[in-house]
Amino acid sequence: MPTTALTGIGQLVTNDPALGEGPLGLRRDAAIVFEDGVVAWVGDSAHVPATDTAHDLDGRAVLPGFVESHSHLVFAGDRAEEFAARMSGRPYGAGGIRTTIEATRAATDEQLGANVRRLLDESLRAGSTTVECKSGYGQSVEHELRSVRVAGRYTDEVTLLAAHVPPPEYAGRVDDYVAMACAEMIPRCAPHAKWIDVFCEQGAFDRDQAHAVLTAGIAHGLVPRVHGNQLHRGPGVQLAVEVGAASVDHVTYIDDADIEALAHSDTVATLLPGADFCTRNSYPDARALLDAGVTVALGADCNPGTSYTTSLPFCIALAVRELRMTPDEAVWAATAGGARALRRGDVGVLTPGARADALALDAPSHLHLAYRPGVPLISRVWREGTLAYATN
């Protein structure tokens, strides 16, 4: 098989302490070899084995490709006017998730697919090489089915967000919607998805309703995820731990009992600071979670209403500035942490046998991601060993 070497790496983030310094497994003056889509060798530039091709990175930092474990990409339209109203403190009665449900239902499959492809290309340019993609803007059997099918054209990490908000036709009949989702939607959509998700929050679905949807998904072979504790202290975190969810996302309003439950579970706390930034919400207490030993991931939460960004570098900068994470913690959370949230061991790391997903910065160190917010530092991206994006 053809082999490719990246040499002259000023700083290599492996995320394997056995390969370098600290939790990020940092190596200096390093090299890495890709073969047949995976990492074949990691070591010093001075000792790199012979390869078919080699690229000198001239002192740039190299990291694992970012792992985006939370995105809502299957939608139509935008909510820019709603955003402007929110920022100016004006009421905007036409806004909300239901606006996007209406636009998404009206769009063709081709239009939805083009939007997913556009946003995935944007994510790639920002360094994301693995992207989870949710449905959730259909909220009917027909429209959720086509949403997961559209998502499945572009990613293996498809989530059926079967309970986002009750659609207009189920106003005042949330239990009826849940019964429909469990009896009809989930059985039809499960063959096209990997994950089942719910929005467990006041104004959306309560604990019992969310539990019913998650257990129905589990019965059809889907692995649970939970949107929880975004707007209020509620049952989302405890429910996620109870059902063995891979991740509970947002976790903005939590207490000591929630932190303790997460610390004694395999459920990852996925923080989405872009949503808090764009809504002027409080930020989650990342420091308390990390200090308690909770596994933390970072996601961009790309969606048209509350976080219309695909940039994990931006979220890393927010995490360091607003969530009081260290630069090392934030980079780990956006790479290995995201992989943990997707229960993946082959991405988010640059170790022999891992998938050859990597990015190079126009900077000598990963610290520059938080140090230089808003600067487009991603200069090259490799996916499965193939150069997928380059600035020049």
Swiss-Prot record:
Major enzyme class: hydrolase
Cofactors needed by this protein, per the record, are:
Zn(2+); Fe(3+)
* Database matches in Pfam families: Amidohydro_1 (PF01979)
Keyword entries, A-Z? Cytoplasm, Histidine metabolism, Hydrolase, Iron, Metal-binding, Zinc
Gene3D superfamilies for this protein: Metal-dependent hydrolases (3.20.20.140), Urease, subunit C, domain 1 (2.30.40.10)
Q: Name one GO cellular component term.
A: cytoplasm
Annotated positions binding 4-imidazolone-5-propanoate: R79, Y137, H164, Q230, T306
Q: Main subcellular localization, coarse class? A: cytoplasm
What are this entry's molecular-function GO terms? imidazolonepropionase activity; iron ion binding; zinc ion binding
Catalyzed reactions:
4-imidazolone-5-propanoate + H2O = N-formimidoyl-L-glutamate
Where is the protein localized? Cytoplasm
Report the co-factor binding details.
Binds 1 zinc or iron ion per subunit.
Cite the EC number.
3.5.2.7
Note whether Iron occurs among the keywords: yes
* Family from the record: Belongs to the metallo-dependent hydrolases superfamily. HutI family.
Q: What does this protein do?
A: Catalyzes the hydrolytic cleavage of the carbon-nitrogen bond in imidazolone-5-propanoate to yield N-formimidoyl-L-glutamate. It is the third step in the universal histidine degradation pathway.
Protein name as catalogued:
Imidazolonepropionase
